[in-house]
Curated annotation (Swiss-Prot):
GO function terms (MF aspect): mannan endo-1,4-beta-mannosidase activity
pH-activity note: Optimum pH is 5.2.
Protein name according to UniProt: Mannan endo-1,4-beta-mannosidase
Keywords, in A-Z order: Disulfide bond, Glycosidase, Hydrolase, Signal
PTM description: The disulfide bond between Cys-192 and Cys-259 has not been observed in X-ray crystallography. This may be a consequence of the X-ray radiation.
Taxonomic lineage: Eukaryota, Metazoa, Spiralia, Lophotrochozoa, Mollusca
Family statement: Belongs to the glycosyl hydrolase 5 (cellulase A) family.
Length: 367
């Protein structure tokens, strides 16, 4: 009996600390935390992982990790497949046949480097903000469930399963700005699929390609697949604007649990936390911007991270003031955009502004 009790005690205390959700807060190892960091985005666009490609950008990746750690940050968002330029492996008919034999080892090498710097990594799988030469690969996954299932079976689940015990894996971002390819202005008797509220909003800038239902299914199926192999995984979507991320203010939340399940039918295929991007237009934020509201104004029941922003498109706000706003107005994280764009020093000043803060969530913590 004593040995059994000790074994149970060891198992319960030896569990790996992970990011988790508590109401509208993010927790790590039982403590309320705030995700403070930046978008690496990429070093070599769409060619950073797999086919031994990580070695080419390794020094830049690790320099970013070092900078963020030294300025008090704790997390990085980085892009993976984008539109399928180099990963995963596709056949001539658009089905995913697998991943090359270095994709997981490349990702793991990056995660190990991040762990040495106490930084959580969030991999963004796909990108909806552009439509480029290999978009036909992503398009197949969006419109054909057989092709989407081939990606899930032969790439996504093997990746998620192989990396689930990596301490630096913060979570999975299914798609960057799906609204870039949404069909705005569509009427539907199902509110989840009605996009009339996006008419004239700028949504669909890369092409009016997919219905809200197709986007929701794409997210729902992948979120469910990740959780099937890793029930504790954190999943999000990098939404372009609060107009698609809240039911408040006359908008509609395309990524609510109800709408994602309605679109794809998989009960577990929901988000762990919301993520929104915000930039000014003609030096002004839209009235729906998170930099004009406290988190509570959006009436969401899950945490929200401001996943892209920067001083250069911040309506006159400094990087420091933007991080301060996100931290003190109820949000759960702030990732400035990006290492590949605009002033890195400006971004680092914003990250440093929150260094060692604990009053609205712990910013520095060990992995």
């Amino acid at each position: 009996m004593l040995l059994t009790a000790l074994a149970v005690l060891f198992a319960s205390t030896g569990c790996q600390a992970r990011l988790s959700v508590s109401g509208t807060n993010l927790n790590y190892n039982g403590h309320h935390i705030f995700l403070s960091g930046a978008n690496q985005a990429w070093v070599n666009y769409a060619r950073d992982f797999g086919h031994n490609q990580y070695s080419k950008g390794k020094s830049t990746f690790e320099s970013t990790l070092s900078d963020i750690q030294s300025h008090g940050g704790n997390s990085v968002r980085v892009w993976l497949h984008i539109e399928g330029e180099s990963t995963p492996e596709f056949d001539n008919n658009g089905y995913v046949t697998g991943i090359d034999n270095t994709l997981i080892s490349d990702m793991r090498a990056y995660l190990h480097a991040a762990q040495r710097h106490n930084i959580l990594i969030f991999f963004t799988l796909w990108n909806g903000a552009v439509k480029q030469s290999t978009h036909y690969r992503l398009n197949g996954l969006m419109v054909d469930t057989r092709k989407l299932q081939s990606y899930i079976d032969h790439a996504l689940k093997p990746m998620a399963n192989a990396l689930k015990n990596e301490k630096a894996l913060g979570g999975w971002d299914i798609m960057n700005e799906p609204e870039g390819e949404i069909k705005p202005g569509e009427s539907s008797s199902e509110p989840c699929f009605d996009t009339r509220h996006l008419s004239g909003s700028g949504a669909g800038w890369a092409g009016h390609l997919y219905s809200a239902q197709e986007i929701g299914r794409f997210v729902n199926w992948q979120a469910a697949a990740i959780k099937e192999v890793d029930p504790g995984a954190m999943v999000t979507v990098g939404s372009w604007n609060m107009k698609a991320d809240t039911d408040a203010m006359g908008f509609h939340n395309l990524y609510s649990d109800h709408c994602l399940v309605k679109a794809g039918g998989k009960q577990s295929g929901t988000l762990s936390f919301y993520q929104v991007h915000t930039y000014d237009w003609q030096n002004h934020f839209g009235n729906e911007s998170p930099f004009k509201h406290s988190f509570s104004n959006f009436r969401l029941k899950k945490p929200m991270v401001i996943g892209e922003f920067n001083q250069e498109h911040g309506a006159g706000m400094s990087s420091e003031s933007m991080f301060e706003w996100a931290y003190t107005k109820g949000y759960s994280g702030a990732w400035t955009w990006s290492r590949t764009d605009v002033s890195w020093n400006n971004q680092l000043r914003g990250i440093q502004h929150l260094k060692s803060r604990t009053d609205h969530g712990q910013v520095q913590f060990g992995l």
